[in-house]
A protein has these predicted regions:
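Histidine/lysine/aspartate-rich catalytic loop segments that bind and position anionic ligands
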Residues: 127-179
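Hydrophobic faces of well-ordered beta-strands that scaffold small-molecule active sites
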Residues: 2-8, 40-42, 67-69, 89-91, ...
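Glycine-enriched alpha-helix->loop->beta-strand junction motifs that scaffold or abut catalytic
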Residues: 36-38, 62-64, 83-89, 123, ...
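Conserved N-terminal beta1-alpha1 strand-loop-helix module at the mouth
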Residues: 1-86, 167
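Glycine-rich phosphate-binding active-site loops on the catalytic face of alpha/beta enzymes
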Residues: 91-98, 149-161, 205-225
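Alpha-helix-loop-beta-strand connector modules within alpha/beta enzyme cores
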Residues: 49-75, 109-129, 165-188, 194, ...
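Catalytic cores of alpha/beta
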Residues: 75-84, 135-145, 188, 192-207
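C-terminal helical cap(s) of enzyme catalytic domains, especially alpha/beta-barrels
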Residues: 60, 103, 164, 219-241
Length: 241
């Protein structure tokens, strides 16, 4: 069964807009798990524009499901992850000026770099995932880095699905199939929503985990956080039947 990890960056963005501690990220993480969320995802950036590095240490004791930290493996990020020891780290090639993640790794071009980083995390007992575009040509190199998983960057699927182009799922299916054949588990995330999650997982039932933040928090404004999480879980369950 595909697991739902809730990305709480958007909650941190709301908090930071006023400079205080409302909404409280720790309380939000506790509630998300009580409501059925099967993991908590955060994506700290060096400028701390949403998740602050201190948030990682505050959240670690209360995440009783799975803690997934995403980010570009610069020195400060690596130190943060090694000190906090989440269940999973997802490596993302963030551009400094990017509003949000907008591309996966070129695992061929950055093979040596990724291999060294992944070795460090795996020696610390941390499961490692590589953020990847839906490109089968990048899968073999991803597997050879020593990574445990890939996370499919699903923005293009979400955009095309919204336009009615269901064939946009095909490169994701091909990439996921090849990843599994190469011994990698497959996660997915970015712009997945209540509108498209069921179709995506039905077409790729091997997905181990989805990480959803922006859409889920936005939908929760209308439906409530508990109702929204439960709605995702129902759609995932139906898709996995």
């Amino acid at each position: 069964m595909t697991k739902l990890s809730v990305n709480i960056n958007k909650i941190a963005t709301i908090r930071n807009a006023r400079g205080g501690n409302t909404p409280n990220l720790v309380e939000a993480a506790i509630k998300i798990q009580e409501f059925g969320g099967q993991g908590i995802t955060i994506h700290p950036r060096p400028d701390e524009r949403h998740i602050r590095y201190q948030d990682v240490y505050d959240l670690k004791p209360v995440v009783t499901t799975e803690f997934n930290i995403e980010g570009k493996p610069v020195d400060s990020f690596m130190e943060l992850v090694l000190n906090s020891k989440p269940e999973q780290v997802t490596l993302v090639p963030d551009a400094e000026d990017a509003i949000t993640s907008n591309a996966g790794w070129d695992t061929i071009k950055h093979f040596d770099y990724l291999t060294d980083v992944i070795k460090t995390f795996k020696e610390a007992g941390i499961r490692t995932s590589i953020f990847l575009d839906p490109n089968p040509a990048l899968v073999e190199a991803a597997a050879k880095t020593g990574a445990d998983r890939i996370e499919l960057y699903t923005e293009e699927f979400a955009t095309q699905f919204g336009l009615g182009n269901l064939e946009a799922i095909n490169p994701y299916k091909e990439t996921a199939k090849l990843a599994i054949e190469n011994g990698l588990a497959v996660n997915a995330g970015h712009d997945l929503s209540l509108d498209n999650i069921e179709y995506f997982i039905r077409e790729i039932p091997q997905i181990s985990e989805v990480s959803i933040g922006h859409a889920l928090i936005s939908e929760a404004l209308y439906l409530g956080l508990e109702n929204t999480i439960q709605a995702y879980l129902r759609k995932i369950e139906v898709a996995n039947l």
